[in-house]
Design a protein with these regions (language model features):
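Register-specific detector for alpha-helical tandem repeat solenoids, activating on a conserved position
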Residues: 134, 173-174, 205-206, 231-232, ...
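Short, polar/proline-rich extracytoplasmic segments that appear immediately after membrane translocation
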Residues: 9-53
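Bacterial Sec-dependent N-terminal signal peptides
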Residues: 1-11
Length: 501
């Protein structure tokens, strides 16, 4: 017992230190934040304990300045724990921490062309992306987030975000924006965001816009429950061939240009999308020209106001089911199906077009369409029908429901419909408000097989609005077929007369 008592007396300070260390939580950083611990023999031992600096939030402006100022440009960027930084990596001087007086120091470490972003003083700490992570790593934008040229970000081939905690982020718009110009080819081929926590994010617009060299992108675990904006999200991701989108889109209001210029996509499953809140589908699938099929049959479009160019240049689509679309609130259908070259059938017979003001180029260059039922279209509010049916392979058109009193543009309306033989109209088809001759220029140009109801044949020198008339009505020539017994007032008591100079 005497030996034990003597041992305890001689080593009491050491034993107390062991007890103190045993009470410190695992993962606490040592060496920066210091607290004195007084022991019975008056020896003061300094032990590092955690304080408020357990929050390592990245300052996005400083991060981009560091990348831009590198003497050796980086081609790979890794967000890692301090323990994962290679031992021979050089620490750069700038502290990449948020200016909140609470965040611990975050440094960039470089070895060759690789950059590692990690906490400076805690081997196991996680890095936090800021609440507003818009333009986190981006180029070619304007605003007060950062000034100057940051073009070196274009040289990055790899970005891996294993230790980037995004649980606090609310805004991811433009997060990896690489520009919308097709000439701005970026080097980025690998972007690992598979571990992103997106539960609090409301905006993902332009998130991957212009990442034109990405061949794959794993967003399958994204929680999009609170996202309201997905516009331009994958715009110009030209090298992607597929996307696994297990998205909850119930709150999304804007899907405009979401997949525009994803020219490499060969498959895209959006069949489970809840689009009940969406208002804009402008350019949504524009130029997805490698898709051969696209299931949008379950889309709820009751709140959509614009479908402009929605399927424009989907040159590989052979079938497209839009028969369930609710379009009562849509005002713009211009170029909606333009350049759908290989569509052989299209059912738009149930479309409610009562609020539509523009149908310009709506079916332009649907070159495989031989039939199209638009006999129920309500066009009473349409102002432009420019190029509406141009370059289609239709043999006949029933436009008997068309009220064109408000239409001011009919240029190229039937341009190069070389197989068209018959156009049926009622007396509500008027050109009275197409007052500028250029607005009916080449209206019937190239309709070589077209014949009016009383036998008036197509004449290549007679192709403007003058011949948008029921053939034989009031003893005048025209290319339309219709009832000759109705009033020539053309359906409106205040309709202007049609000049046949």
């Amino acid at each position: 017992m005497k030996n034990v008592s003597a041992f305890l007396k001689r080593h009491s300070a050491l034993l107390l230190l062991v007890l103190v260390l045993a009470t410190v939580p695992a993962g606490i950083a040592f060496g920066k934040y210091v607290k004195s611990v007084k022991v019975t023999n008056e020896i003061s031992i300094k032990v590092s304990v955690a304080t408020s600096a357990t929050n390592y939030t990245i300052d996005k402006t400083t991060l981009k300045e560091v990348l831009q100022d590198l003497q050796t440009p980086a081609t790979a960027l890794y967000f890692v724990k301090r323990s994962q930084v290679p031992v021979n990596a050089k620490q750069l001087e700038t502290d990449i921490k948020a200016d909140d007086n609470k965040s611990g120091s975050i440094f960039a470490y470089q070895i060759g062309n690789d950059i590692y972003i990690a906490p400076a003083d805690n081997v196991d700490a996680r890095l936090y992306a800021p609440v507003d992570s818009s333009y986190f790593l981006s180029i070619n934008y304007s605003g007060d987030i950062i000034s100057g040229d940051i073009s070196r970000i274009k040289l990055l081939k790899t970005i891996k975000c294993d230790n980037l905690d995004t649980s606090r982020v609310e805004n991811m718009s433009n997060m990896f924006y690489m520009g919308k110009s097709k000439a701005s080819d970026t080097a980025l081929t690998t972007l690992d965001v598979s571990k992103f926590n997106t539960a609090n994010v409301t905006d993902m617009s332009y998130m991957f816009c212009g990442c034109d060299s990405l061949t794959s992108l794993d967003v399958s675990k994204f929680n999009t429950t609170n996202v309201t904006n997905m516009s331009y999200m994958f715009y110009d991701c030209r090298a992607l061939t597929s996307l696994d989108l297990n998205f909850n889109t119930s709150k999304v209001t804007d899907m405009s240009s979401m997949f525009t210029d994803c020219i490499g996509l060969t498959s895209l499953n959006v069949s489970s999308f809840d689009t009940s809140s969406v208002k804009s589908m402008t350019d949504m699938f524009n130029a997805c020209n490698s898709l051969t099929s696209l299931d949008v049959s379950n889309f709820n479009t009751s709140n959509v106001t614009t479908m402009q160019s929605m399927f424009d240049a989907c040159k590989g689509l052979t079938t497209l089911n839009v028969s369930n679309f609710k379009t009562s609130n849509v005002t713009d259908m211009s170029s909606m199906f333009q350049d759908c070259w290989v569509l052989t059938s299209l059912n738009v017979s149930s479309f409610d077009t009562s609020k539509v003001t523009s149908m310009s180029y709506m079916f332009r260059k649907c070159t495989e369409l031989t039939t199209l039922d638009v006999s129920n279209f309500n066009t009473s509010n349409v102002e432009s029908m420019e190029g509406m049916f141009s370059a289609c392979s239709l043999t006949s058109l029933d436009l008997s429901s068309f009220d064109t009193y408000k239409v001011t543009k009919m240029k190229y309306m039937f341009y190069n419909c070389s197989n068209l033989t018959t156009i049926k109209v009622s007396d509500k088809f008027t050109t009275g408000n197409v007052t500028n001759s250029t607005n009916s220029f080449y209206m019937f140009q190239g309709c070589e097989k077209l014949v009016g109801g009383k036998g008036t044949p197509y004449n290549s020198s007679e192709t403007d609005k003058t011949y948008a008339w029921i053939d034989g009505k009031d003893n005048k020539r025209g290319y339309f077929t219709g009832d000759l017994t109705t009033n020539s007032v053309i359906g409106h008591s205040d309709a202007p007369g049609i000049s046949f100079d």
